[in-house]
């Protein structure tokens, strides 16, 4: 892969999921990569192992010698000292999505978009193509167990990209196949209204060339509404609504899911996934539909889906003692994702008490969706709400908005056992008492709640967890 005379790329915010994937792809393609981030961890350490030079913190001198500087939408360009220094030095400064568009230019692009499920669907498609010997290039905004990372540099013609709608980033991509996996209100700080978000998805779909294909999930009402505006060939998929590709005979059993597919009049049985939940059946249908469009034999697609083994922080089991005590970590941060994750836990582990531990992400999202979070979490047997992870926002701009807003919404939705615990140490102390057989401790959120999940899993792994019994902690059975 070549980008003219560009040889050295500096990435601001390199530890982020989407940015680290670009860094990894550039490294594997022979570029010199430097990057900076306010914090270090597993992701930045892995990049360093691949040859990247990683700086902790932002300093002007770190962009010296770079041919281009790349940054994500999460970075405020006017406030970042490295971006300011690059512009003063005449070094081109571009956003992540523009770099992605350049990397895709001469490939057969498969772009997966949607307010939910795009990371998993992208990884499923990647797994299927690799298992079908297509050797794709892949960029995912998360770590795939199968890929052992977020990026693959393949020799084949396909480039599989997770397409992010935040800041309209996906409109810079050039898909030949565009998957629209889901659509509802999200990222209102970018779009302002749901109608504006819908128009962006229409524009994304219409970037497909006349010989390409748009693949749409018709179980989502907002997708059905915008399909008439998509001036391209479409394949539809779903479970509840009539579609070209549909799933039936769905069986959810712990970590495994089985179902059958009817596609364009043909039936395919014994489809098996190593991940739980109806939402993952929809993700698999999106992947299967994509594979059919590429002309891959259905039998190979089904075998590839069976090899998909999950994503880091997508219902990731961090501890399981085999006697009913589990610690699960999930990235769910939108009410619909929280609902799907709790539902997967309740339907797959019917004999377990589900102890949901939720960290809200963003003050604006908490304020906008408090009622919906309450309803989604109320289906768990016990709910702990942590304080809000602010990310790019400041609490002073949102007076009166904290985790108690969601805890109160859970109570109003019928949740009988819910607590707001702002301090992480106090929350850890409370969760130790729940580390008994028969309980699934289900951590959800896009912030640093994952560190608490790891800490609780380590506590359980050290053998401190006690045997559950009729009188243990909760005093009630799983509902």
Curated annotation (Swiss-Prot):
What SUPFAM superfamilies does the entry give?
MurCD N-terminal domain, MurD-like peptide ligases, catalytic domain, MurD-like peptide ligases, peptide-binding domain
- Gene3D superfamilies tied to this protein: Mur ligase, C-terminal domain, Mur-like, catalytic domain, NAD(P)-binding Rossmann-like Domain
| One Gene Ontology term of the molecular function aspect | ATP binding
- ATP-binding recorded as keyword: yes
**UniProt keyword annotation of Glycoprotein present:** no
What keywords are annotated for this sequence in UniProt?
Answer: ATP-binding, Cell cycle, Cell division, Cell shape, Cell wall biogenesis/degradation, Cytoplasm, Ligase, Nucleotide-binding, Peptidoglycan synthesis
User: Which top EC class applies here?
Assistant: ligase
Q: Which domain of life is it from?
A: Bacteria
Biochemical pathway? Cell wall biogenesis; peptidoglycan biosynthesis
Q: Where in the cell is it found?
A: Cytoplasm
Read off the InterPro entries from this record: Mur-like_cat_sf, Mur_ligase_C, Mur_ligase_C_dom_sf, Mur_ligase_cen, Mur_ligase_N, MurCDEF_pg_biosynth, UDP-N-AcMur_Ala_ligase_MurC
Q: What does this protein do?
A: Cell wall formation.
The family note in this entry says:
Belongs to the MurCDEF family.
What is this protein's record name?
A: UDP-N-acetylmuramate--L-alanine ligase
């Amino acid at each position: 892969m070549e980008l003219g005379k560009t040889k050295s790329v500096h990435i601001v915010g390199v530890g982020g999921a989407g940015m680290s994937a670009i860094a990894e792809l550039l490294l594997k393609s022979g570029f010199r990569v430097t990057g900076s981030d306010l914090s270090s961890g597993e992701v930045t350490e892995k990049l360093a192992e691949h040859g990247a030079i990683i700086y902790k913190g932002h300093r002007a001198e770190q962009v010296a010698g770079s041919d281009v500087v790349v940054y994500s939408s999460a970075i405020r360009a006017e406030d970042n000292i490295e971006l300011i220094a690059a512009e003063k030095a005449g070094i081109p400064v571009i956003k992540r999505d523009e770099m992605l568009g350049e990397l895709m230019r001469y490939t057969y692009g498969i772009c997966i978009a949607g307010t939910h499920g795009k990371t998993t669907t992208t990884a499923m498609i990647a797994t299927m193509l690799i298992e079908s010997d297509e050797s794709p290039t892949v960029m995912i905004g998360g770590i795939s167990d199968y890929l052992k990372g977020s990026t693959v540099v393949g020799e084949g013609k396909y480039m599989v990209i997770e397409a992010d709608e935040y800041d309209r980033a996906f409109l810079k991509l050039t898909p030949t196949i565009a998957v629209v996996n889901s659509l509802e209100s999200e990222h209102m700080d970018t779009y302002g209204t749901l109608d504006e978000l819908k128009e962006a998805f229409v524009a994304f779909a219409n970037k497909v060339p006349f010989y390409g294909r748009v693949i749409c999930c018709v179980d989502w009402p907002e997708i059905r509404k915008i399909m008439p505006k998509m001036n391209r060939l479409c394949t539809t998929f779903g479970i509840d609504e009539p579609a070209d590709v549909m799933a039936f005979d769905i069986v959810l059993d712990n970590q495994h899911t089985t179902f059958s597919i009817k596609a364009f009049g043909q039936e395919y049985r014994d489809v098996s996934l190593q991940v739980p939940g109806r939402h993952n059946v929809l993700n698999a249908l999106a992947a299967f539909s994509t594979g059919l469009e590429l002309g891959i034999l259905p039998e190979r697609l089904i075998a590839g889906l069976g090899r998909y083994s999950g994503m880091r922080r997508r219902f990731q089991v961090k501890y399981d003692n085999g006697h009913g005590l589990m610690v699960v970590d999930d990235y769910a941060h939108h009410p619909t994702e929280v609902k799907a994750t709790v539902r997967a836990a309740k339907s797959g582990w019917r004999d377990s008490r589900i102890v949901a531990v939720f960290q809200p992400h963003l003050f604006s999202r908490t304020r906008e969706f408090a009622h919906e979070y309450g309803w989604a979490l109320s289906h768990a047997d016990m709910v702990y709400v942590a304080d809000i992870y602010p990310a790019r926002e400041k609490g002073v701009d949102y007076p009166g908005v904290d985790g108690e807003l969601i805890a109160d919404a859970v109570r109003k939705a019928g949740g009988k056992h819910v607590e707001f615990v702002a301090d992480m140490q106090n929350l850890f102390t409370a969760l130790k008492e729940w580390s008994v057989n028969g309980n699934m401790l289900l951590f959800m959120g896009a912030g640093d709640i994952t560190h608490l999940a790891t800490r609780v899993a380590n506590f359980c792994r050290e053998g401190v967890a006690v045997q559950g019994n009729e009188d243990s902690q909760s005093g009630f059975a799983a509902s």
